[in-house]
């Protein structure tokens, strides 16, 4: 019977720690997701050939022209 109160004490000690740890873990995951997304976007921006950039600029210019 002496083992169960010890287990309950240990569980009670661990429960408050799990909350903040899980919250911090979720925040880290979200932060990492945004960092990875930013790096991927930067890679695509810099990874394009100059010709592709020119084509994209032309497309944007065409979109900017009001259609008659």
Swiss-Prot record:
Membrane topology qualifier: Single-pass membrane protein
Supply the alphabetized keyword list: Endoplasmic reticulum, Membrane, Transmembrane, Transmembrane helix
Q: Which Pfam families match?
A: YBR126W-A
Tell me where in or outside the cell this protein is found. Endoplasmic reticulum; Membrane
Positions of transmembrane segments: 24-44
Q: Name one GO cellular component term.
A: membrane
Protein's UniProt name = Uncharacterized protein YBR126W-A
Q: Which organism is it from?
A: Saccharomyces cerevisiae (strain ATCC 204508 / S288c)
């Amino acid at each position: 019977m002496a083992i169960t109160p010890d287990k309950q004490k240990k569980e009670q000690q661990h429960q408050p720690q799990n909350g903040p740890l899980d919250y911090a873990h979720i925040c880290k995951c979200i932060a990492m997701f945004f960092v990875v997304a930013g790096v991927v976007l930067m890679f695509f921006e810099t990874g394009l050939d100059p010709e592709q950039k020119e084509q994209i600029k032309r497309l944007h210019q065409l979109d900017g022209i009001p259609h008659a």
